[in-house]
Amino acid sequence: MRLFSVATIGLAAVLALSSCAKLKKPSVEKAIDSVNVIDSANLTDIMMTVADPNEAVNYFQRSLQKEPDRIDFTRGLAKSLIRAGRASEAMVVYEKIVADKTVTSQDRVNFAGALIRTNEWKRAEAQLNKVPPTYETYQRYRLAAMIADSNKAWKKSDSFYEIAAGMTTKPAGVLNNWGYSKLTRGDFAAAEKLFLEAISYDKKMFTAKNNLVLARASQRKYTLPVIQLTQTERAKLLHTMAISAIKQGDVDIARGLLADAIDTSPRYFDAAVRTLAALNNS
C-alpha cells in the first residue's frame, strides 16, 4: 500500500513537472521574443545616432530586404542617408514615408530638411506647410527660418530664428545661421552680435568665428575680436580679414594683415603667401 502511494506520488510529480514544462515553454519563448524586440529597437537607435553613417545605411537596407513593411526601418534608412551626406537618395526614401498612412509631422519636417539640402526650397516649404501649427519643435522653426530667408521674408525669418534659439540648450548653430542671415542683408552690427553669442555657446565653432571676422571687416574693423583662438585659427582669420580689406580697397591694411597671418601661422601658409605676393606685384 505504501509502495502504491509512493508510486502514485512519483507519477503525479512527473505529470506535474511535465505540465509545468508545457506551460513554461511558450512563456520563455515569449520572453525571448520580447528581449529580441528590445535589442532590435536599441540597435536601430544606435544605428541612427552613433554608428558609422554608411554602416547604418547598409544595416537598414538589409533589414528592409527581410521586412520591407517596417516603416521604422524605412525612417532609419532615410535618416542614415542624410547622415552619410546622401540627401538625394534620402529624398526618394522620404517620398515613400510621407506617402505612408502612418506619416507623422516629424516625418514631414525631416523630409523638408532633406529637400533643403538639395536646394528644393519650394518643395520643402510645401512639406512644412502640411505640419499643423501645434507641432512646435526646434527643428521645425529652424527650417522655417531658413525657408523665410530664401524668400527674403526677413521679419518671419527673425521671428523663427528667435523661437528656434529659445527651444534648444545648444543654440550655437541656429545663432550662427541667424547671424549669417543678417550678414547677407548688410546688417553687419547685428550679425556681429549674433556670431559672438553663438561662440559663447560653442567656443570651438570656427565657422562662427570666421563669420564674425567677416562681419567686423565689413564695418572696417580690422582687428581680431577678443575670443579664444588657436594659432592656426588666428592665422586663418587674419587671412580672411585681409581678403575683405582687399575687396573694400584697403590694400595697405591687407598687406599688413597678410604679413601677420604668415608670421602667426605655425605652418607654411601658402594661401597667404600667394595673396601677399600677388598684392606686391600688382
Name each model-derived stretch.
Residues 20-76, 83-88, 92:
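N-terminal leader/linker segments that initiate helical-solenoid repeat arrays
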Residues 45, 79, 113, 146, ...:
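Residue-level recognition of tetratricopeptide repeat
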Residues 66, 99-101, 131-135, 166-167, ...:
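Structural marker of alpha-solenoid helical repeat scaffolds
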Residues 71-72, 104-106, 136-139, 171-173, ...:
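Helix-start (N-cap) detector for alpha-helical repeat units in TPR-like alpha-solenoids
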Residues 76, 110, 143-144, 177, ...:
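Canonical tetratricopeptide repeat
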